[in-house]
């Protein structure tokens, strides 16, 4: 028996697991210290009342013989797919319900979508980058080419005509940098993909945090994107579903390679390897897209974005360069005093008892930078900022 030796090419530990390990070790060495995390992007506010009510009603349904439900539809219940179609319609993006696949979060689908692509495809990935994009392709043994994100291009890499790629990862608003592609720059990627017969895997998990109405919140707002892009979205940060688990993937019927519709390939993959998201969770997700539910969710988003404003204000006062925080819950800052990413991590942890995420963990171009998130409790955020000011 042979193992998949590609796994041996992975880093020893997933970035956020490594951060958690270091924090745990520090706590053991310094008992009684109050640690405040502005690091991993988990939410802190509870689910919206409309979501709780819908899930409670669904639980009651499951307790009655007449309304009990077993296995659900492979693509997700029609009521949720219809709600998502309505949500996209407000963006002037028209989807068919057959193009929407309900899953347990963007992370899973971003990794699993690779099942429908050959392992000899060349993958183009931005650097800095969410580690899942890299690790899942290393696991499969694909060739990876990195495109440089830096202060000169505002951490928004653009196509290089001299590079030929088959699969392209884009995330906007970006994790970790908080940068957001405008329509003109995103159109350059769509044109590149169409010219090179490539497929864009577009992570829009943070689209609900975009406040500038001129910025796209779906790649399908760009002409031609339905012929070259798959979009992944999640309710984790938008609706507080990090522990509930629900997201969706859009695979347009227009998207084919050769004569093969990728929608059919993904459906075949899902019917074989995935049994769907629970009815109770999907009813909660449906409520999140209702008028009343979304208004409640918007209050949570506004709360987190006020946290982002406070973080940005503090960094400005300290003279620290940063990006993000305006249309994204992430703030990407340059480490002060020439410190490396992990040196700044250690300084914040030991001197301020504050946790963030070292930029180097997101790729070589992240060295010297650091990510803070706006998902904390307001009082904790204020306390953390006071500590940062005082070191």
Q: Could you say what each language-model-derived stretch is?
A:
Residues 19, 38, 55, 84, ...:
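Generic structural signal for small/hydrophobic residues in well-ordered secondary structure
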Residues 221-302, 309, 313, 391:
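Conserved core segment of the aminotransferase class I/II
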Residues 2-104, 112, 288-291:
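N-terminal small-domain helix-loop-helix segment of the aminotransferase-like
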Residues 46, 304-305, 318-351:
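Conserved PLP-binding catalytic core of the aspartate aminotransferase-like
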Residues 282, 286, 301-312, 322-334, ...:
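Conserved glycine-rich beta-strand-loop-beta hairpin in the small C-terminal domain of fold type I
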Residues 30, 140, 195-196, 318, ...:
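Helix C-cap/helix->beta junction micro-motif
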Residues 66-193, 207-222:
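Conserved core of the PLP fold type I
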Residues 86, 94, 338, 347-357, ...:
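PLP-dependent enzyme catalytic core of the Aspartate aminotransferase-like
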């Amino acid at each position: 028996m042979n193992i998949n030796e590609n796994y041996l090419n992975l880093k020893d530990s997933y970035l956020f697991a490594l951060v958690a390990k270091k924090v745990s070790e520090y706590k053991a060495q310094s008992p009684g210290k109050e640690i405040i995390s502005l690091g991993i992007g988990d939410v802190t506010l509870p689910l919206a009342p409309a979501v709780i009510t819908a899930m409670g009603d669904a639980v009651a349904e499951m307790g009655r013989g007449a309304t009990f439900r077993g296995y659900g539809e492979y693509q997700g219940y029609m009521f949720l797919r219809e709600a998502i179609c309505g949500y996209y319609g407000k963006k002037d993006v028209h989807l068919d319900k057959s193009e929407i696949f309900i899953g347990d979060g963007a992370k899973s689908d971003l990794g699993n979508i690779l099942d429908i692509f050959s392992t000899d495809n060349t993958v183009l990935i931005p650097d800095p980058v969410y580690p899942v994009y890299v690790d899942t392709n290393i696991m499969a043994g694909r060739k990876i080419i990195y495109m440089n994100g830096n202060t000169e291009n505002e951490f928004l890499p653009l196509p290089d005509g001299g590079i030929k790629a088959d699969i392209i990862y884009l995330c906007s608003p970006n994790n970790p940098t908080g940068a957001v592609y405008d329509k003109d720059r995103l159109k350059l990627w769509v044109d590149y993909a169409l010219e090179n017969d490539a497929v864009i895997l577009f992570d829009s998990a943070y689209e609900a945090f975009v406040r500038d109405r001129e910025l796209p919140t779906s790649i399908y707002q760009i002409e031609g994107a339905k012929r070259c892009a798959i979009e992944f979205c999640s309710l984790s940060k938008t609706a507080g579903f990090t522990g509930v688990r629900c997201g969706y993937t859009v695979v347009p019927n227009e998207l084919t390679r050769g004569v093969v519709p990728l929608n059919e390939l993904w459906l075949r993959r899902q019917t074989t390897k995935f049994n769907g998201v629970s009815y109770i969770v999907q009813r909660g997700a449906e409520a999140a897209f209702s008028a009343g539910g979304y208004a409640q969710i918007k209050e949570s988003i506004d709360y987190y974005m006020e946290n982002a404003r406070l973080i940005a204000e503090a960094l400005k006062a300290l003279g620290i360069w940063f990006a993000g925080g305006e249309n994204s819950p992430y703030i990407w800052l340059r480490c002060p005093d020439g410190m490396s990413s992990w040196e700044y991590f250690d300084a914040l942890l030991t001197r301020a008892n504050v946790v963030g995420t070292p930029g180097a963990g997101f790729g070589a171009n992240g060295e010297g930078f650091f990510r803070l998130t706006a998902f904390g409790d307001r009082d904790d955020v204020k306390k953390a900022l006071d500590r940062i000011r005082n070191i």
